[in-house]
UniProtKB/Swiss-Prot annotation:
Residues annotated as domain TrmE-type G: 231-404
Record Gene3D superfamilies: P-loop containing nucleotide triphosphate hydrolases, Probable tRNA modification gtpase trme, domain 1, tRNA modification GTPase MnmE domain 2
PANTHER family (UniProt xref): TRNA MODIFICATION GTPASE GTPBP3, TRNA MODIFICATION GTPASE GTPBP3, MITOCHONDRIAL
Cofactor dependence: K(+)
Organism of derivation: Paracidovorax citrulli (strain AAC00-1) (Acidovorax citrulli)
Name of the protein this chain belongs to: tRNA modification GTPase MnmE
CDD domains: trmE, TrmE_N
Residues at which (6S)-5-formyl-5,6,7,8-tetrahydrofolate binds: 25, 82, 135, 482
Length: 482
């Protein structure tokens, strides 16, 4: 059990800085006396009341709306008070301080503190309370953070579906089927003297096979949801003046990186998140790769190689106007050799031939798009002009293919890497269970254990079996007041 989860808590629930409206939120059990002290009257549940907010001396701090949500019909499942005032940081700090002060003051009716133990909330603690009070499960709690952090419309919509329970419903259906299968195995173990073969009569083989098929479908949708949330990291690399910064600007649709004819203009990485069909791509422009005597440029080049080593995909940019020049091709070959050593084996390296609009007569020049051969021996290359935009759609298609994106299916929900890991664990345990069922005289105790472990992995997704350490990591990523 998480520590101090019964303390009443308070926090500013809106983002730091100035705004038209700011909210101070209080959650706890039995906060009625504090509500009356702060608002000067009892409030009707779930109705907005316009009133002045006053300090301990009766002086007005501000005027605004107060809303009272008695348990269990609130965000946290506890009594909740929200004070909506003008969004200046000083006003909100004064309101928050007044909440903490009034909680410790003696109530006139009882002579006891109005809300003893009221403290500032930790990041994510209001949502943590909602989880602990069964208002939401863990996957829905994560969806709240994903909705707040969504960088694309598709990511926001998928997070909203997860918050509504779409992902959790799929997990619960898998769990129910798994529990039924476990019941058959446990019955066979518990009543060995019975003549009924529970497993054969109930077609345990067929049930397990159907469960594995459903799991495969859920894993496919989960991979797509994780992609919408996480995106992929794409590094643009190549020699100086190949057009790396121009390509970043073209993909982003904005002048993010400085472009000049001077080699070595880019000294450090420039990063921008773009979206293609709702998939976030974290594109990084790097320093031109070459031997340099300039200390600052050398640092930038080393950082470029570090980014390449951590990339999900690398765009190796070539200058079509210099194709066929021995020195240029030799330098490209050296970069290609180091890419083969530095980039992880599973990371695709795409050859991108730039400046097709200026390469008339070049053997490699063309109309733009995806070519059929690659100068560095890889399967395909992309030919384009970052200046005119010719061929960019072909590159976008290649990037979506690398990401593993399929056209967005209806009802896709957001997901996280830990969800995929849990589902892979379920898949592994179900495969072990299937192997046991295939044996003559299966070891029922081993079969039962594999099914138990599969259910445990499913429960970890929704938080029905989750370590306190994991909960701490998840909720600490929220902002204070959420």
């Amino acid at each position: 059990m998480l520590p101090r989860h019964t303390d009443p808590i308070a926090a500013i629930a809106t983002a730091p800085g100035r705004g038209a409206v700011g909210i101070v939120r209080v959650s706890g059990r039995g906060i009625g006396p504090l509500v009356e002290a702060l608002c000067g009257r009892a409030l009707r549940p779930r109705e907005a009341t316009y009133l002045p907010f006053r300090d301990a001396g009766g002086q007005a701090i501000d005027q605004g709306l107060a809303l009272y949500f008695p348990a269990p019909h609130s965000y946290t499942g506890e009594d909740v008070l929200e004070l909506q005032a003008h969004g200046g940081p000083v006003v909100l700090q004064l309101l928050l301080a007044r909440c903490l002060q009034a909680a410790g003051e003696a109530d006139r009716a009882t002579g006891r503190p109005r809300l003893p133990g009221l403290r500032l909330a930790r990041p994510g603690e209001f949502t943590e309370r909602a989880f602990l009070n069964d208002k939401i499960d863990l996957a829905q709690a994560e969806a709240i953070a994903d909705l707040i952090d969504a960088s694309t419309e598709a990511a926001a919509r998928s997070a909203s579906r997860s918050l509504a329970g779409a992902f959790s419903d799929e997990i619960h259906r898998l769990r129910d089927a798994l529990v039924h299968l476990r019941m058959l195995v446990e019955a066979t173990l518990d009543f060995p003297e019975e003549e009924i073969d529970f497993l054969r009569k109930a077609d345990a083989h067929g049930q397990l096979a159907a469960l594995q098929r459903t799991l495969a479908e859920v894993m496919g949708r989960t991979r797509q949801g994780a992609l919408l949330r996480e995106g992929i990291k794409v590094v643009i690399a190549g020699q100086p003046n190949a057009g790396k910064s121009s390509l970043l600007n073209a993909l982003a649709g904005a002048e993010l990186a400085i472009v000049t004819p001077i080699a070595g203009t880019t000294r450090d990485k420039v990063q921008q998140t773009i979206q293609i069909e709702g998939v976030p791509l974290h594109v990084i422009d790097t320093a031109g790769l070459r031997e340099s005597d300039d200390e600052v440029e050398r640092i930038g080049i080393e950082r470029a190689w570090q980014e390449i080593a951590a990339a999900d995909a690398v765009l190796f940019l070539h200058d079509l106007t210099r194709a066929g020049q021995p020195d240029y091709e030799a330098a490209d070959a050296e970069i290609a050799a180091r890419l083969a050593r530095m980039a992880p084996a599973h990371v695709p390296v795409v050859d991108v031939w730039n400046k097709s609009d200026r390469a008339e007569g070049s053997a490699a020049a063309g109309q733009g798009g995806v070519a059929t051969a690659s100068a560095s021996g890889r399967a395909a290359a992309v030919r384009l002009s970052a200046r005119t935009g010719e061929g960019l759609d072909g590159l976008r298609r290649v990037l979506l293919d690398i990401a593993g994106w399929q056209s967005a299916p209806e009802g896709i929900y957001t997901a996280r890497a830990r969800h995929l890991e849990a589902l892979r664990a379920v898949d592994m345990h179900l495969m072990e269970a299937a192997a046991q069922l295939q044996c003559d005289g299966p070891a029922l105790d081993l079969l039962a254990e594999e099914l138990r472990l599969a259910q445990q992995a499913l429960n970890a997704i929704t938080g029905e079996f989750t370590s306190d350490d994991l909960l701490g990591v998840i909720f600490s990523s929220f902002c204070i007041g959420k």
